[in-house]
Amino acid sequence: MSPKTRLDSDFFGPGDRWQTVAGVDEVGRGCLFGPVVTAAVILPETAIAPLQQAGVTDSKRLSQRQRQQLYPLICEVALATGWGLASVAEIERWNILQATFLAMRRAIAKLDRPISRCLIDGNQQVPQLTYPQTTVIQGDRHCITIAAASILAKVWRDRLIERLDERYPGYALGRHKGYGTAQHRQAILQLGPTPLHRIRFLRSLRQPSQQIDLF
């Protein structure tokens, strides 16, 4: 974490303890392909300093190798972990924001411990959540539990997309993990979308000069 890191406990309410507070984050909101994935994690206070020393921070600031090294460490020391997924069909039906909230609720529901509060990355509260919650802007940079959740979500989703790369060759999914790189966009224009591409997102690819009708 950075020198400006705030302790998660800065966001605790009365009665909250480390062992009852869950950090929650998502990955894949801006992708053209695949589900949005979320993770929730509860850490013991004794794990905070070791995880900070190990380099746990926002997953986007870490290399793939660093994330893969930290993933088993987080799982080992965590009191509880949970993952949630919202499918492409759910993203298409509800929109990406509501699908992300759905995935977050699913991840939190898989935590097998009492929960007194959820620390949510971002500035929007999760609707229909039955626990008290606090949103933290750039929480994955400031809160160790949210940072840990960001790593768990990122590694889990990356592994899923790498498996799907074998099912849908030609799109280089294993390289860009479904994000809208130039290579990915060009592959879609050449090959057309797969069943796991987000049609709402792909509409932005349509240009008058393109001779290929994707839809």
Curated annotation (Swiss-Prot):
A divalent metal cation binds at D25, E26, D121. The keyword ATP-binding does not apply. The keyword Magnesium does not apply. GO terms for biological process: DNA replication, removal of RNA primer; mismatch repair. Its EC number is 3.1.26.4. Transmembrane segments: none annotated. It is found in: Cytoplasm. It catalyses: Endonucleolytic cleavage to 5'-phosphomonoester. GO terms for cellular component: cytoplasm; ribonuclease H2 complex. Residues 19-213 form the RNase H type-2 domain. Keywords: Cytoplasm, Endonuclease, Hydrolase, Manganese, Metal-binding, Nuclease. Its cofactor is Mn(2+); Mg(2+). GO terms for molecular function: manganese ion binding; RNA binding; RNA-DNA hybrid ribonuclease activity. NCBIfam families: PRK00015.1-3, PRK13925.1. Belongs to the RNase HII family. Endonuclease that specifically degrades the RNA of RNA-DNA hybrids. HAMAP family: RNase_HII_B. This is Ribonuclease HII. It comes from Synechococcus elongatus (strain ATCC 33912 / PCC 7942 / FACHB-805) (Anacystis nidulans R2).
